[in-house]
UniProtKB/Swiss-Prot annotation:
Name assigned to this protein: Proteasome subunit alpha type-4
Top-rank taxon: Eukaryota
Family label: Belongs to the peptidase T1A family.
Gene: Prosalpha3
Record InterPro entries: Ntn_hydrolases_N, Proteasome_alpha, Proteasome_alpha-type, Proteasome_asu_N, Proteasome_bsu_CS, Proteasome_sua/b
Length: 264
């Protein structure tokens, strides 16, 4: 029955569903994982790299994380060619605003502009939705640090921590639990890095997390300037080693506790 309604973007099914939008969301759920965490002193984006071939040119820009302007960065999950179109459009929107008004575009306004375009592709015939979701991290004078997520339907929202891509449900559950445990504690960027490694280690479909499989970037304010930096492979490796050591110590303590328990 669904085949009657899923060939065109603009036709609702009897249940009120737009199948092409749902198929776009399904494509994203098979893409590499991306997660974002909002901290007190900055924002973190972390992403799974699936193109780890040693023949790839390391000078080519990031596979998953893109700088949009001086104050905003985004991470993508989904069809890469669609992501390239949308990131180019985001940069153009930001440049036009800065040229017209002489200041950097507010974060939410940039996200909203792009989502209007994405929503239009769910409403006009002869087009299909963009098969990509985006995470945006940014800073502006009004709201400070901000983390947003948008999907193929054109919907967007602000988050403290979220995830898109493969195994996003398990990752969001972990983030929710970890942040609930630290509800009364201010989360620093260093804590966010450790948390990102923990979540990726436990949710990626890989036997062992390596620096080649992870991209991490941070955004901070230093001396009244927004500073965007991508973590180098040795820095990521140190974070992975730290997590591995903590896990080994926790496992050893658990076994020791079990050994001390009296047998019935």
């Amino acid at each position: 029955m669904a085949r009657r309604y899923d060939s065109r973007t603009t036709i609702f099914s009897p249940e009120g569903r737009l199948y092409q939008v749902e198929y776009a969301m399904e494509a994203i759920s098979h893409a590499g994982t991306c997660l974002g965490i909002l901290a007190e002193d900055g924002i973190l984006l972390a992403a799974e790299c699936r193109s780890t071939n040693k023949l790839l040119d390391s000078a080519i820009p990031s596979e998953k994380i893109y700088r949009l302007n001086d104050n905003m960065v985004c991470s993508v999950a989904g069809i890469t060619s669609d992501a390239n179109v949308l990131t180019s459009e985001l940069r153009l929107i930001a440049q036009r605003y800065q040229f017209s008004y002489g200041e950097v575009i507010p974060c939410e306004q940039l996200v909203s502009h792009l989502c209007d375009i994405k929503q239009a592709y769910t409403q006009y015939g002869g087009k299909r939705p963009f098969g990509v979701s985006l995470l945006y991290m940014g800073w502006d004078n009004k709201y400070g640090y901000q983390l947003y997520q948008s999907d193929p339907s054109g919907n967007y929202g602000g988050w403290k921590a979220t995830c898109i891509g493969n195994n996003f449900g398990a990752a969001i559950s972990m983030l929710k639990q970890e942040l609930a445990d630290k509800e009364n504690v201010k989360l620093t960027l260093a804590d966010a890095k450790d948390l990102a490694i923990k979540v990726l280690s436990m949710t990626l479909d890989t036997t062992k997390l390596t620096p080649e499989k992870v991209e991490m970037a941070t955004l901070q304010r230093v001396d009244n300037k927004t500073v965007y930096s991508v973590l180098e492979k040795p820095d990521v490796e140190k974070l992975i080693e730290k997590y591995t050591k903590v896990q080994a110590e926790a496992e050893a303590a658990k076994k020791e506790k079990q050994a001390k328990q009296p047998t019935k």
